[in-house]
Amino acid sequence: MKANLRSRLFSPITIAGVFFFIASSILTSEPYLLMLTAAQLIFVPLMLQLLLETKRKHIIFNWIAMLSIFLLQVVPSSTGQMVLAFIYMIFTFFVACYGLKRFFQRGFTNWAEISIDIGMMYLFVGGLWFFAYIAGIDTGFSPLITWLTAIHFHYSAFLLPISLGFFGRLHDSTWYRLIVPIILAGPMLVAIGISFSPLLEFISVLLYIFAIYTLIVLAYRTRFLSHLQTILIRLSFSALGITILFSLLYATNNSFGLWFVSIDFMLKFHGLFNCLIFGMLGVLGWVLVPPKTKQDVWNFPVSQIRGVLKGAGKQHPGLVDELSDFVEINTLPRTIVHFYENTDQYRLFASVKWATWFKPFAVCYKLISTKLQQLNLPISSKRTEMTYKIRAVDQTLDGRKNPRAWIRQVKENTVFVAIYSQHKKEGRTYMNIALPLPYSSMIGILQLDAIDGSLILSSEGESDTGIYLAAGKALFKLPLSEHFLINETIAGILTAHHKMRIFGIPFLHIDYTINQK
C-alpha cells in the first residue's frame, strides 16, 4: 500500500501538478478559481493514473494539459489563453475517447465499469465549458455560471462517477445498481435544470440526494481494502451528503423563492467543501489501494459469419445433437427432447406481440428488416405458421463447433437466420447462437435449465450468458435479454413463450405452438 501510494503521489506528473498548482495560487487574482485548477492539475491526473496504461502518449498528453492550465495564469493575451484552453479541451476529448473505447470493448454490463466510462466521457463536457469560459463565448449565461458549469463537470460528473466506479469494484448490490444510473444522469439533469427549468433542477437534486445518501449508507456497510481507505472514502462520500443539502436550498430558492442561498455562499462553502473533503480525501483514498476490476474477459467462440449467410450445406435434423449436453433430460417430457434433436419433424406456429410503447420503433425497423431478411418479425399479432429448414454450416467459415443454420420464414419472407452451436465453460455447456447482420453478428449465449418439467433458456444466467454484438474483434454486450419457457401442454404438443426486454423493460412477446408433422 505504501509503495503504491509513493509511486502515485510522488510520480513526476503528480509532483508537477502540485508545483503548478502552488505557482497558480500565487499568480491568480481570484482565489475561488483555484477549486477548478486543483481538479485540473491534481485530482484529474491522479485518477487518470489509476485508469490509463502508463504509455508514453498518455504521459505526454497529461504533461501538455497541465502545462497549458498553468500557463493560463501567466499568458496575458486573450488569443494565447484561448489556444491554451483549447489544448486542455483536446486533452479532455482524448480522455472521453478512451472512456468510450472502454465502453465499446465491454458494453452494457458491470455498472462499476460503466460509471468509470461515463465519468471519463463527462470530462470532455467540462473541457468544453472551460474553453467557453476562457474564450468568453456567449453561452447565454454569465461568465460565473459558465465557470461553475465547468467545475460541476469536473467534480460531480468526473470525480464522483470514477469514485462510484471504484466503490462498485468493492461493493455490488441491488441498491448500488439502482443509484448508479441516478448519479450518472444527475450532472446532466441538474445542468439542464439550471439552464432551462428551476423545477427540473429541484426534482433532479431530490433524486440526487436520495442516491447520495444511499451511497453513504452503502459505504458504511462495505469493507474497504485498508483502514485508512475506509476513513477517507467514507468522509469523502459523507461530505457530499452535506453539500448536496445546500444544493437543495439553492434549487428551492430558484424554484419557489424560499431559503435564500447566494452564489457567493455556494462558492465559499459548497465549492470549498467539495474540493477539500470530497475531492482531495476521495482521490487519496483510491490512490492508497486502487481496487481491481472484476470484469471478466469474454473468450467464448464467436461466429465469423457476417452479412448474408453463405456456405449452408446439407439438411440437418435438429438444433442440437444431444440435449443432454446442456441439461439433465430425465425430468423433461420426451417431446421437448425430441423436438430439439429432431426439429425438422415439427410444425411451428407463432403469434408476435409487440409492447404498445415499442410498436412505433417496430414499424420503423420493419422497413429495414424487410430488406435485410433478418430479425424480420411480423407487426401483426395474428397467429401464423413459420416454415423452416435446418442446414449444416461450414465450420471453417463459422469458426465454431458443428454449426447449423435454422432458417425460418413466414410465407416468402425470411424471419430469422440463426446459426446454432455450443461451447463449454467451467463444466457447463451453453447454447451459442449467431444471427448474421451487415458487417456484424448478434450473438446470444443461453443457459438451459430443466425446472418442474419445463425447459428454460435464458440470457440472464451465469458466466458468458447474454446478448452481444460482434463487429471486427470487438464484442459489445447489448442491453437486451431473452427468456424462453417451453412446456408440453398436451401429449405431443409443445408451447413456447419467448419474452424479450431492453434495459429491463418488456418489448416483445412471442407465443409458439409446436406439434409433430
Where are these regions (language model features)?
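Hydrophobic alpha-helical transmembrane segments of multi-pass integral membrane proteins
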Residues: 1-310, 494, 498
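Soluble ligand-binding/transfer domains with enclosed cavities or grooves
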Residues: 305-510, 515
